[in-house]
Amino acid sequence: MLLQKIESPKDLKKLSIEELKKLSSEIREIIINTVENNGGHLASNLGTVELTLALHYVFDAPKDKIIWDVGHQAYTHKLITGRAKDFHTLRQYGGISGYIAPWESEYDHFAVGHAGTSLSAALGFAKARDLKGEKYKVVAVIGDGALTSGMALEALNQIGYLNTDLIVILNDNEHSISPNVGAMALYLAKLRKHPLYRFFKQTTQNLLKNSSIGKGLLAFDLKLERSLKSLLLENPMFEYLGFKYFGPFDGHDIPLLISVFKGIKDNLSCPVLIHVTTKKGIGHKDAEATPSKFHSIGSKSEKEKKVPTYTEVFGKALVELGGMYPEVVAITAAMPEGTGLSYFAQRFPERFFDVGIAEQHAVTFAAGLAKNGLKPVVAIYSTFLQRSFDQIIHDVCLQKLPITFVLDRAGIVSDDGPTHQGIFDLSYLRLIPNMVIAAPKDESELRDLLYTAINYPGPFAIRYPKGKGVGVELKNRFEKIEIGKSEIVKQGRDVLILAIGSMVYPAVEAGNILRSEGIYPTVVNVRFLKPLDILTLEELILSHNTIITVEENVITGGLFGAIAELINILKINKKVIPIGLPDKFIEQGNVQLLRDIYGLNEYKIAEKIISVLEDIKV
């Protein structure tokens, strides 16, 4: 195999065009086999193989800085930068990351996992280079989906204004996780589809691939191309922002990409945007046909589960509630399938809004809808809601608007690693006035909390984990839950276990283990982090000598913080022992493994409580 000879991009430069094409086929096969076994981002990586090879063929990494947006499409980059022998460990505990990780390789310059960061980071690299008097190229690779994010557009504005030597590669595959939406997507489609421009592109691309053409003709072709675009397009947006725009080019045509990249690298030292079009999922029949379903796939073990996921239960429950309440509207930030809102979109398309990768806009858009009498439900991953923190405070909670925030992927989220763990939401939402925060113990309680939230006249956040529910039977009706009311699941006397959300069932099982050891705990489903059930909790705290909190969230500021503060306010002289996640970023790994490592399964919870009780006796 050719890949066995590639230890670094320097080895890549020794290959012929035909060998590069053969290498691209080898890489696709490795990516497909690895992702089907380990899980990961399939469609996006299959779409960037040739683009990545051409980039590393022309630019001199790691001296030249290639800054990836999101980083989920960089598997080829990893394979040709010395990590091929470890690629089988992709997204596994202790293995290589599914994203860009500077601690992993000198070729990974900027840690990433969220969309829209590459242009700002690349501009920082470029300006630092200039101020230090250094000479190298900075290339940012961003997808058309990520380009819809506000941060990316802010960076485009600044890059053009500063007139910095920086190359932006726009990887246009017409998808982010789901098909792209908005005016930017329409604008890029206009660039791709103009018939006269497409004729011109076909002609010049054939010329560009001729290796005998010199730099002079290449430079002439680029100037001619730009002149023709100005005649064809009513509003060449990127040019107005201060970029020299070239494209669209076929992102799977290796000789063409090499010619374009070389020409621009050697001839230009200003802001340049190179527009390449790629096919998401190319090389895998099913992924090409339905790329959104193959954006990120689970491992083989994950595919065997039959119990419905929390995402499915939420999505179908919202459809039921949408039928009951015509004022309910649903909003997602480019993730209708991932959040379960695709069910609602199919049933109520006029009441469904996909705003693209624009979490800040999603929240304030919801605020406007709520202010005018509607009931918005904003479904978003826990890790991505962080991006709209100011909007939640300033535009929603300050006005106490009736918006339901549904936080999917809360807690440990397995193999995507530190950028995607949903372990901070209990902490960062708890400090905001007027916010109700709840976490269901199971999928049935999720349905009732959703019903309760939609009927609540203020901001209401519901968080739940990734993956299947616990398998309880779902009722065919909704029941309103009293705001702030906890639930005593098991009554005991020796120790008080206060658990929330995904930790309630493990706490109950831990209680069963303790009972077998002659220890009788009281187990409480706290359910509402805010407001707390103060009356019930005060009574329970006073009647137990040992208090344990259990949460799948960082200990700082979450359930432990809330209970410790309550005890202090009530002037109760008792100690609280926290079980939760430490003050660190949690690595990638299987959920069950990580819960074991961090003491969040029933066995480790029971073990910890036994240890605490033994220490108290001593």
Swiss-Prot record:
Superkingdom, natural source: Bacteria
BP-aspect Gene Ontology terms: 1-deoxy-D-xylulose 5-phosphate biosynthetic process; isopentenyl diphosphate biosynthetic process, methylerythritol 4-phosphate pathway; terpenoid biosynthetic process; thiamine biosynthetic process
Cofactor mode of binding and number, as noted: Binds 1 Mg(2+) ion per subunit. Binds 1 thiamine pyrophosphate per subunit.
Cofactors (names): Mg(2+); thiamine diphosphate
PANTHER family: 1-D-DEOXYXYLULOSE 5-PHOSPHATE SYNTHASE-RELATED (PTHR43322), 1-DEOXY-D-XYLULOSE-5-PHOSPHATE SYNTHASE, CHLOROPLASTIC (PTHR43322:SF5)
Protein family according to the UniProt entry: Belongs to the transketolase family. DXPS subfamily.
Record-given protein name: 1-deoxy-D-xylulose-5-phosphate synthase
Organism listed in the record: Dictyoglomus turgidum (strain DSM 6724 / Z-1310)
Name of encoding gene: dxs
